[in-house]
Amino acid sequence: MAGRPEKCFSLIRFTLLCLKMVISSKTAPEIPTIDQAYSKISNSITVEWTTVPGATSYLLTAEDGNTIIETTVANSPGTVTGLKAATLYQITIRSISASGQSQASSPKQAKTVLAAPVLEVSSPSPDSILVSWDAVYMAIGFSVSVMRANGLGRIWKENTTNTSLTFSSLDAGTLYTIKAYAWNANGIPGDDSTRNQRTSPRAPANIQVFFDSGALKASVSWTPTEGAFNYTVVASSDSSQRSCSTTLSSCSISSLQCGTEYLISVSANNDAGSSKSCSAPTLKTVACAPGRVMIQEEPPGHLSVAWSNVELGDYYVAFVKSDDGLEVHCNTSLTQCNFLSECGFTYFISVFAYNKAGQSPLGDVFNYTTAPCCPNDISPVLVSSDRVEIAWSPVRGAELYETKAIAGYSIVECNDTAPACTLSALDCDTKYNVTVYSFSEVRGSNLSCSSHFITTAPCSPEIKNISKDAFSMINVHWRSTNEGATYTVTAQGKKGLFQCSSTGETCRMGGLPCGSMFSVTAVAETQAGKSLPSYSVPLETVPCCPAGLTAAQVTQSIINVSWTAGAVAQTYAAVLESYIGQSKCHTHQNHCLLGCITCGINYTVALKAISSTGLTADCAYQSYSSSVCCPLGVKLYRLGPNGIRIYWRASRGAANYSTDLYGSKGIFTCAPHAGLSFCDITNIPCGDVYTVMVSPVAETGLKLTFCPKKIYSVTCSGSTLGMVIYRGKRNDTASPR
């Protein structure tokens, strides 16, 4: 059962194939006939045939037994490509139309031609080209031709069965075109191969050499040669070789060695190779600079220069140039020269050898330095108590200056490259022997330099104490060891500068403002200069007295003394003094309350301003009279139907009084006549409470308000005054401020 469906399907496929063949035989185009098939290129065959009516294209097929290659073409002739060289193919063709394609035509055989040989070309000499290749399949011979690439001139052609050929008698440096192909046993040529090759150039002629002795450089020139792309110049000696390349007809070889003989050769180059080198005459360079140069100064002021002999040197010139630009020289065939020299100069010495090629290169330049000269214009720039600054003009040849200051066993030194020196840590008011030696690293110190004497400035004085005499003069005392010195004392502060001078050990100054701080210093001065200031001593002047001292009675027994603050004062002491006694207060404020004052007494008021350090200024003295004492026994009496009499008992001393009656219905005042101790007030409203105060009146007319006050009630009796009743005292008298 399983095999029956497969048999059924096979039968159906066979029936359909037969049906297709019947249909195609009825509608396909005619089968074309191949007229000829041939090969001109090793990878293709060209086919020619008779055109079939109704055919729109043709299918060419080439088969060699292993591969089948098909190509569709529009009409005859058609070419099948992609074939193998020297291979026999069977060619068929089918015509194609819209209805289908025909059966294959009768086959025709055709063989592809031989492959082109792969060429290797070179130019072994300027007039020849060597052509070589590998064997070609099915080839029995080869044909090779050579001609100029520009098509001019003759053509060289050779046939051979070998795989190489050499063409000679060619033009040097010329581009040639080489063609080659192989043929088979039937003499049919295969594909050809083409290469271009240039012959190598001939060697340059007319070589000339020019030598630059200063640059150790040789310039070589020649006549250009045909076909040369560039040129190579080589300079060879026994020990070295130098070269240069160029596309021009000249070239320079640099960095040649002195004292050397070179052989110069020039070769031309192109893509085929190089010509044989053409040699020019030998080149002798300049001699090398003399070596082992020795310089001696014997005796001083005379220089002797000697050197060793060198190869190719005919004579020598020695140059000696000083550092100021002056130059001398000597010309000799020997190996030594002598020159004059001076102190303080550096001489630069060079030796050259000469021959026909010119001057030798510059060798080592030697320098010789003579002993430096001594400074002769030494002068002090600054002289202080422990330091001396000196300066001088620079001298020739000095690289360093050594300065020594000697006083007894004390030696102070300083070294510097500058023409100046600061000698420090010296003793004050001391005479030193100062010498400046010039020094160079090569020659050392010149010990013949002369010395100078310099005295340092005086020593600083030491202030021992500062005192003040009865005339407010400041006395300053100091201690010093200087001889013949003048001393200046300076007091400096924010409020100015004050000075005094003396040749002794004390001086006086006055006029210093109060309330100031000063820094007091002393300076000694001699012909050598000024000392450093002494250590400063602070000086404080007494504080300034305040201005505007006033005294005001606060109560009958208390006085308020006030003033404006004075400069520097920290506290104040106020004293109120009379024959009875005194009252004091000490405060940091600008007012003070003094108690236990007796009324009606003359006092003296004194004020002292005291600084934070305890300095005291006695500032003010003035007299002050205390107020009249308050009256005693103040009473109110009814005086008629509408009046009140105020009565009191006067205290000691005569005084004027003023009475005041305060009520809710008004204030009533009266001033009694001098000497009276009562005062009457009329038209007083009844039915009110009154406060009564009797006040002394000062000479200035000021009414004092600190006396006690009493309270009375005044009743009404009908429309007139009734009873006057005492109610007590009021406690609102002025309190101390």
Curated annotation (Swiss-Prot):
GO CC terms in record: extracellular region
The record's annotation in PROSITE patterns points to: FN3
Q: Where is the Fibronectin type-III domain?
A: 28-115, 116-203, 204-288, 289-373, 374-459, 460-544, 545-633, 631-715
Query: What are the protein's UniProt keywords?
Result: Glycoprotein, Repeat, Secreted, Signal
Q: Where in the cell is it found?
A: Secreted
Q: Where is the signal peptide?
A: 1-25
Would you list which residues are glycosylated? 230, 433
User: What is the protein's name according to its record?
Assistant: Fibronectin type III domain-containing protein 7
Q: Please name the source species.
A: Mus musculus (Mouse)
